[in-house]
């Protein structure tokens, strides 16, 4: 059995190194071999230039493909894995196209493992644990109101004037600002077309409590069922969102204003220009520590009184083992690979 790890970007290295150093049969595929060698300096491993046809030739039944490539590659690689009776792992959200491969994977007797990084990933574990604990409390009745919050973000450990730094291309962050979101607020669906219209303050209950800015991200509603909320629960609030440093909204106000005006091909071109400029001005320096904050919170109330409330939280930062983001994304991926092995 071989592990074909595709992609050696900044979020991939700690987990990849762990698999190699633990003695697993790992083959690395990267679009630029020299970059992969530099990232894995001092580690003995076979590295090939990424090409899906070359990967297909070397892929054998029971092998595992790990995709740490851009999202467009996940489904093609998962399809390749199924066709060769191999397994597939990624840290990314399950797209509708990936979901449609479920029955084919079952028929082939292989695993497709996704959403196994930080967010999505570790946040799911925290959410399921909270829901299970609330159910076991036996405090719930028909009048209980439930509020769920899950906020995650990567920020610079030492805040800068821009209130953010980039560890890879800013284009994904900029495009996400053009994405709508759905959540529940005050018992009703809350739909937002522009994230900056829903930015609020959040007091994170860390060991040293700290105020951040948060906003809803993507479509939160399918996770009500995924986290196995009781169908009879009255859901007052349910939101999965992004966390940023206090002052981020003000620092990015002019960016929000410009993004609102961008459309079509000219808009895409301008986004790329902005991305390149932000990368020059606000990329992490070598060995500069980042910081990751994750808070998952579940609260139950009856007659305006809190009867149950718990928060799972994580506050991590980069060190000699790698950035916090890289460790928290790639280590869970490596654990999933080990589970399949």
Whereabouts are the PLM-identified features?
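Conserved N-terminal Rossmann-fold NAD(P)-binding element of oxidoreductases
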Residues: 3-8
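N-terminal Rossmann-fold NAD(P) dinucleotide-binding loop
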Residues: 12-13
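NAD(P)-binding Rossmann-fold cofactor-contacting core
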Residues: 26-39
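Rossmann-fold cofactor-recognition segment
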Residues: 42-53
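N-terminal Rossmann-like NAD(P) cofactor-binding module of classical short-chain dehydrogenase/reductase
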Residues: 63-68, 88-90
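ADP-ribose/adenylate-binding Rossmann-like module
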Residues: 80-98
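Rossmann-fold NAD(P)-binding glycine/threonine-rich loop
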Residues: 92-114
